[in-house]
Amino acid sequence: MTIKRIDPEDRWSEAVIYNDTVYYTAVPENLSGDIIEQTADTLAAIDVLLQRVGSDKSKILDATLFLADKADFAENGILTRRVPGFHPREAQRQMAISVTEVIDKQGVLIAEAGTGTGKTYAYLVPALRSGKKTIISTGSKALQDQLYSRDLPTIIEALDYDGTTALLKGRSNYLCLERLEQQMLSGGDLEAEVLADVMHVRQWSTQTEDGDISRCHSVAEDSKVWPLVTSTNDNCLGSDCPRYKECYVLSARKNALAADVVVVNHHLFMADTVVKDTGFGELIPDAEIMIFDEAHQIPDIASHYFGQQLTSRQLFDLARDMIVAYRTEVRDQVQLQKSADRLTQMVQDFRLSLGDTGFRGNLRELLQNKETKRYLTLLDDALELSYDVMKLSLGRSQLLDSAFERATLYRNRLKRLIDTTIAGYSYWFESYGRHFLLAITPLSVADKFRELIKSHKSSWIFTSATLSVDEKMSYYTDRLGLENATTLILNSPFDYQHQTLLCVPRYLPPLNQPYTAKRLAAMLAPVILKNQGRCFFLCTSHAMMRGLAEEFKASLPLPVLMQGEMGKSQLLKKFVSSGNALLVATQSFWEGVDVRGDTLSCVIIDKLPFTAPDDPLLRARIEDCQLRGGDAFRDVQIPDAVITLKQGVGRLIRDIHDYGAIIVCDDRLVSRPYGEVFLSSLPPSPRTRSLEKTSYFLSQRAQRNEIVSES
């Protein structure tokens, strides 16, 4: 069998076999001419191609795809020629080949790709080359927007891809014109600030084409107005809505259904797949390729959607809609106002009974407290009263009919949450600000997720920079029931031996003591000052974050920023624009934050990020592990902490020109046997226990970068 090139254009479209010859309508330049004169790498690719084609002519297009992917990522391949700044990376090429093979076989691939591997291109190119319907799911809205607005268009242009694409977010990301109109008609009792935002949204609504609220720059992303002018699956009127034909959610879904490539996020995907919550379920059966980026989040998100929950926000929203319906459509039913006020009051009282904010606890234990149980009973009674009052006015108001359906759902869900006798679930609650959440979560989602995969005959790709523990994938595969998946671990191309330094300081203060924050701040202030800020201090608790921020603000002549002082995006912008700031943060800043260059050259972590032992979700997983005969500390707690630590450390080096130090303020990393599991899971950085050497390393690298930039 021979290969002949029959079209001079630089793109792939079709291949045919005739007289035992493979004819390609466009072979890239590095495959043109006599194949005997090609490089060894090209010959190897051709050899694999011919082996895979064999005598089965139906395989020719898949084989073409395989060879095309190798050529795309070659030294003089199409990406090098068409994507500015693209440099071939062996790990990226390996991942692209693995993705191609899984697409061909309709298999499951779990790929850990270290920072800088270029995993986005490694899955985009094979997916687009295949021509199959593809869903790409991300862990955050930020990555979703970046993928759709930057990465996808780049690859589409490079490959001359002629398919269509769509971006689909959850319904709470789109303006609801009907709910906006309701607020305009009945907004008399709104706070002045919220009412002003309603007017801003009203003005923006006359200009927007897609209703995506992230584009309404005149209103803060965390404004209280957004829940009032967006819909949920519970309060949406569906086809009964007077503005149904103008619905932005409906329009976005139609675009997604018609598109060849759809970009969503994990919450949207799981909500639809598990509880049919988003209304784009028609996409799932049609999709032939499912790709999950930031896939380390999937186990926890899946647990959330395979369970049930009831939140104070849902109940406040229900009461609010009852009041709006009373004021605009059923003004003779004054009991609607009274029962809604009663429900609102009982929600507030129950929240107060839970005590401190930012606390997560065991719901089974909580309900043993007679006082708390009394408040929950009063809340249940108020919900029943609202249900009974709304029932008297059914058919008079679409808004009220929708609210009645939600009340029915919530009262049944609350009764399910109060019945803590059902085995196999974790019962837990969380209090935050003026709100609370009551939830039940299955102890394990492995069986359910395995069935989800089996029910869709598609190719499944899961990828992230943080999936393995101690260079093994078993922790991840066991949690999702994917023991038979193909796994791949690709190291980062960054030179951590020269770009980074890992420090575990000597003479650290004891953990979890009232004076820990004060002593840590005193110990680390000189390093931060000498580095001119440019530092993230990642904390494992809000209490430590607040304590450290207070100490640093009193002692450092630098901008000290703290998570919660403003929105996340605003905080990052201020950090970058300052150029010499210290950002003290927790939780959401451990991952999904990308700060490149000299602006960030030091990441400090207060201690190993073990989940609090009294966390109800952790306790449930520990119980499940023990029932299966496992060692909970080894099999659950350590892997959880390793993945989180890898995420935190990953904030530092985002580019080949970055440098910096990682300081972990926890002796256990070097004094306990399990510390080796953490160290072997981190990038291979040189290590020290000296803060002085760490400061010297940072100053030397800063000087070197200044010389390079000046030259």
Regions found by a protein language model. Give the residues of each.
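N-terminal presequence-like segments and the immediate start of the first folded domain
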Residues: 1-61, 67-74
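Conserved pre-motif I regulatory segment
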Residues: 75-111
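A substrate-engagement module of RecA-like helicase motors
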Residues: 75-82, 132-260, 322-323, 327, ...
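Signature of the SF2 helicase/ATPase Hel1-core->accessory helical subdomain module
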Residues: 129, 145, 150-153, 233-234, ...
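Conserved RecA-like ASCE P-loop NTPase motor core of nucleic-acid helicases/translocases
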Residues: 134-140, 462-463, 533-540, 663-665
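A contiguous, basic/glycine-rich beta-loop/short-helix subdomain that forms a polymer-engagement track
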Residues: 227-260, 270-280, 385-508, 515-522, ...
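Conserved RecA-like P-loop NTPase helicase motor core
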Residues: 505-515, 565-669
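Conserved helicase motor "Helicase C" RecA-like lobe of SF1/SF2 P-loop NTPases
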Residues: 540-564
